[in-house]
Amino acid sequence: MPIKNNSKNEKKIYFVIGLGRSGFWAAKYLRSLGKKVIVWESNENEELSETKEILEKLDISVCLNKQFLFEEFSECLNQIEAVVISPAIPIDHKTIIKLKEKGIEVLGEVNIAWESLKNINWIGITGTNGKTTVTHLLSHILRTNNLLAPFAGNIGTPLCKIAYSIKSKNIDWLVAELSSYQIEIATLCIKPKIGIWTTFTADHLDRHKTLDNYFKIKNSLLKQSEFRIYNYDDIHLRENFKSLSKGIWITTSSKQSDLDHCDYWINNEDFIVERQENLLSLKNFKLKGNHNTQNLLLAIAAARKIGLSPEKIKNALLSYEQLPHRMETIYQSNKLEIINDSKATNFDSSTAGIKAIKGAPIIISGGKLKSGSYIEWVNIINKKAKAVFLFGESSQTLKKLILEGGFKKDIFIFNDLSEVINYVYSYIENNQIETLLFSPSCSSFDQFRNYEERGDIFKKLIHEKFNLKLFAHKEFS
């Protein structure tokens, strides 16, 4: 969608719905292009009021506590250039349907950014789990090799902030993490140079209704990409091998039947192999878990496609620091390791994390339950966990699932994370525990704003109760 220049006879107003990070930067970027911008936000609080003041100084009108209702547009329909919606608003929202019926264009922040950034080489990364790690890892590899390769999108920096900030800079690669919510609204717009699909499992079905719809949305990004990289270890992607657009495939499997379909794999000597040639030794890298080996292979495959040598990739990876809240070791001694995996927001990501642990951990889980199969999660709990501590909205449901799976060891229920940590402290003192794993397996929205806040609070509680000096990304007072 070209962003039109204003004239007397053209519609003038861009309505931005939602004042989160993407809405803020969409409004700011559009205003920098000389557009008239009005922002609507359904909530109202001190933080939003401060954001409103910032935008109003730029001559952007901001309305807080304003609901996204079609009737609110009735007096200005003829003045609307486009409505830019938050990723949180589904495209089948009744107001969106009515706006489209009136011929009004409905866009996402990604659409707006694409128009200014489409001449840059994009790497579009999507997947149910793993996309943030691959995005961060690949950007690190490229930036360490003196390529200007910011990461943005669903992680960290909104794409419109990149568009706003880089007018005089020459970006080599834009590494964009793209969620299904973002792809859904911009599906025919974004055309990456390289598309990467990390994993696919049941998630966000409250939004996308069916697994097939969710799959098609993810796949649309890969269809639009010039080159594609897939994870053969993922059962859904593997089962669709023949129907998916041609691309590069990676696997951690050692089965010859799998290797026949793949370009990158791990051999018996722990070497990363690229089409029959040893590329790098896996022993150089410290990411925990098979799922992170998959992430590593996806990033390496992309870096090789871009043209980086194995030596340059190796040197970059040696300086890589893992993102917080993803199998993050926050404390380790010769007796105890404490791991924060707050990003494990569904059964599949939690299962992958538990599998990565050696020995029998005690596990803390709980939060707001999401859709998806729990069978493998229950099985790995039953096989490996020494004890389970549950909290939050889903605690009773999770306990029922675990007990039905045959779990015979200790299982406890608490109201919140603070209560859990208080009890876990004494439990560890009285039992031989080598690993404490915080692996919620649920979203955070019953008690926290997001998984980052949940992970930070977990670290803070551990720090205070255990009186430990943590390997933390932030200091706690």
From Swiss-Prot:
Binding site for ATP: 127-133
Pathway note: Cell wall biogenesis; peptidoglycan biosynthesis
Protein localization: Cytoplasm
E.C. number(s) listed in UniProt: 6.3.2.9
Pfam families: Mur_ligase_C, Mur_ligase_M, MurD-like_N
UniProt cross-references to InterPro entries, sorted A to Z: Mur-like_cat_sf, Mur_ligase_C, Mur_ligase_C_dom_sf, Mur_ligase_cen, MurD
Keyword Nucleotide-binding: yes
Purpose: Cell wall formation. Catalyzes the addition of glutamate to the nucleotide precursor UDP-N-acetylmuramoyl-L-alanine (UMA).
Keywords attached to this entry: ATP-binding, Cell cycle, Cell division, Cell shape, Cell wall biogenesis/degradation, Cytoplasm, Ligase, Nucleotide-binding, Peptidoglycan synthesis
A biological process from GO: cell wall organization
Protein name in the entry: UDP-N-acetylmuramoylalanine--D-glutamate ligase
NCBIfam families: murD (TIGR01087)
Family: Belongs to the MurCDEF family.
The reaction(s) this protein catalyses: UDP-N-acetyl-alpha-D-muramoyl-L-alanine + D-glutamate + ATP = UDP-N-acetyl-alpha-D-muramoyl-L-alanyl-D-glutamate + ADP + phosphate + H(+)
Main localization, broad class: cytoplasm
GO molecular function: ATP binding; UDP-N-acetylmuramoylalanine-D-glutamate ligase activity
GO cellular-component term (any): cytoplasm
